[in-house]
Amino acid sequence: MAQSVPPGDIQTQPGTKIVFNAPYDDKHTYHIKVINSSARRIVYGIKTTNMKRLGVDPPCGVLDPKEAVLLAVSCDAFAFGQEDTNNDRITVEWTNTPDGAAKQFRREWFQGDGMVRRKNLPIEYNP
């Protein structure tokens, strides 16, 4: 059963943070790549700390072993210096899919007994 095996590693490009550059009077989009470097199929979901300012497309999906997906992280226009951006980040959550399951995202796979792993990517805003 896949749920008893801890999920393997993923890689992200960039690996540690996402950087947006001023001006912030228009929407910015930054692409990141998520790679399933494990030997099992995983399901992933992306969370943001500021849903008003940050968006991710696609926000969830399923990746086969060694498969990658390109995500568009968007930052809507905002008043730089007048809003708190210190804690902005996106979090990639992932877990193994059950053995024999269809390659289709299911939210309940995150709510079962299996381990869910997380990787935080802080957002840096350059003035």
From Swiss-Prot:
Note from the entry: Around 30 MSP isoforms may exist in C.elegans.
InterPro entries registered for this protein in UniProt: Ig-like_fold, MSP_dom, Nematode_MSP, PapD-like_sf
The organism of origin for this protein: Caenorhabditis elegans
Name assigned to this protein: Major sperm protein 55/57
Expression sites (tissue/organ): Sperm.
SUPFAM superfamilies documented for this protein: PapD-like
Signal peptide: none
Entry-annotated residues carrying N-acetylalanine: 2
Gene name in the database record: msp-55
Subcellular location: Cell projection, Pseudopodium; Cytoplasm, Cytoskeleton
